[in-house]
Amino acid sequence: MNPLPHRRAIGLMIVAATLWSIAGVVTRQLAPSVQAEGRFEVTFWRSLFAAVFVGGYFLLVRREGWRPLAAAGWPGLVSGLMWAVMFIAFMLALTFTTVANTLLVLSLGPLITALLARAVLKAPIAPRTWTAIAAATAGILWMATQAAPATAAGRPLLGMLIAFSVPVASAINLVTLQKTRARVDLVPAVFLGGVISAALMLPLALPFQAAPRDLLLLAVLGFFQLGLPCMLMVVAARSLSAPEVALLGLLEVVLGPLWAWLGAGEVPAAATLAGGTLVLGALVLNELASLRAGRR
């Protein structure tokens, strides 16, 4: 696939991460009953709307029908399955723990990606990355052990465990993108992920509880927080290295708690701030050092 100019690819990743970061604050605007008891319904509608958005793009804008989906082959299937895991686990995590805790667990993605890239792509891991892994793990352990037994969201430790599956799936997805970016268009995999996620959630989502206002918010999530930014990330990954994608993706972790604080009054706990500072510091320093070393 044809890569974009480097600066344009960076811009796409910044837009994608910013759109991803609105998930928490928009979710908190749903009716309390939907937040508390409709976690499967929320995931279903969000995934379905994302699939509609991406499918509509291929049918109405590119006018290619379903050919790109078939052309994606096994990499598209792997990527689609990983998108489905991320779509499901992220929203379920938000129903059990805070936005800040969820996003900070997601911030382990770059380090998990480095480990997987080492195993699959034979990419070497510098000593600074091992140091960052240790520091980030310490931050996550601090967040987990200091978390209260119950919060406004419900069960924080369970939520953080569910959230951990997101960076794992993201790492598998990113390595798949890296291996195939020159020959396979994996944008259709976002559509496939939405379809798989919606199909798995439908039996658990019934009977529906969402009111028209909730459906409008869920459409915003599906179209602009999920479908569009995931498509942008796939396109940007054709031109950016894995460290660049991971580093720019951390913008979601920085902005997500800010929107939740400003828009939903969800003030991050002291343990989240302390552990998060350690996690983000380790990740950012590691990724910046990696990028500088790559330019030498």
Regions found by a protein language model. Give the residues of each.
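Specific alpha-helical transmembrane segments that line the substrate/conduction pathway
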Residues: E41-V52, M91-P124, A242-W261
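Hydrophobic transmembrane alpha-helices of multi-pass small-molecule transport proteins
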Residues: V54, F58, W83, I125-A147, ...
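C-terminal-most transmembrane helix of multi-pass membrane proteins
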Residues: N2, S47, T145, L250-R296
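Loop-to-transmembrane-helix transition segments
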Residues: R8-A16, E64-A89, L157-V166, L202, ...
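Helix-helix packing/entry segments at the starts of transmembrane helices
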Residues: T102-L108, L177-I196, L226-L262
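Transmembrane alpha-helices of multi-pass small-molecule transport proteins
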Residues: Q35-V85, I112, V168-N173, V190-P207, ...
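Glycine-/small-residue-enriched transmembrane alpha-helix faces in small-molecule transporters
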Residues: M1-F44, L81, A89, A138, ...
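Loop-to-transmembrane alpha-helix entry segments
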Residues: A70, N101-L106, A119-W142, A153-G159, ...
